[in-house]
Design a protein with these regions (language model features):
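Interfacial loop at the N-terminal end of multi-pass membrane proteins
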Residues: 13-18
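CBM-like carbohydrate-recognition segments
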Residues: 20-36, 42, 47-122
Length: 122
């Protein structure tokens, strides 16, 4: 299924409905940034919102840690994550490993580790 953002591009005519990148859209880089940001946001709020942000970040990290997104050691150009995207509208860096995806993935994992050890995440 396509994301809400890609649906907007379809309606605006920027992509055809048969564009393979839209039909099979995945972006580990956006997911890793989001997971890290949600963990940071969880440190600023309480109770229900904290729980929602933390649980959502953990769902994302679990998905990114699966064989679908995490590369085998020594493969994928030695990047950690597969299936990142730089710029769909420009057809640039689509479904490739990106260093900033790995960076934010590791940042999110470190933040989560600090959180479960009752240390400040920042």
């Amino acid at each position: 299924p396509s994301s809400a953002a890609s649906d907007v591009y379809k309606r605006q005519g920027k992509f055809s409905k048969t564009n393979k990148y839209i039909q099979n859209y995945r972006d580990a880089s956006a997911a890793s940034v989001t997971a890290s940001a949600l963990l940071e946001l969880s440190s600023y709020v309480k109770d229900d919102k904290k729980k929602i942000y933390t649980e959502t970040a953990l769902q994302i990290l679990t998905s990114l840690s699966s064989p679908e997104y995490r590369a085998e050691e020594g493969k994928n150009g030695n990047f950690i994550l597969k299936h990142s995207t730089g710029a769909i509208p420009h057809g640039s860096e689509v479904d490739v490993p990106l260093i900033y995806a790995d960076y934010y993935f590791l940042e999110a994992l470190l933040r989560y580790n600090r959180m479960i050890n009752n240390k400040p995440i920042l």
